[in-house]
Amino acid sequence: MTDTMFLDHLAIRLNGERAAGQKLAINWIQPDTGKRYALTVENGVFRYKADAQHVAPQVTISMPRQTLAGVLAGQTTLPAEVQAGRARVDGDAGALRTWVGLMDKFDTNFAIVTP
């Protein structure tokens, strides 16, 4: 899955009703690839811009995509990844918790074909 596909997936998971009153500016840096993204939640919508950074983000996260995917999937926690040295958080970690809390979790165990 490419970064674009991953971020588009996150945009789909964002619960627009819960996010309606939120305004978040998050910078995401992938230290293993050097890629940078400006992530924004505003008006119930998640947007991202590649090769960009917010001038005044609420929080900057530095972690590989697989680490972020694991945190968002609930397979690991951000504190565990920071403790292990696989992630770094600068700024308001509460903004990151808010963003993660705005994501819906989809049930992937459903019948595709039923009688």
Region locations from a protein language model:
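Acidic, aliphatic-rich amphipathic alpha-helical segments
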Residues: 1-47, 93-115
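C-terminal interaction segments
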Residues: 52-115
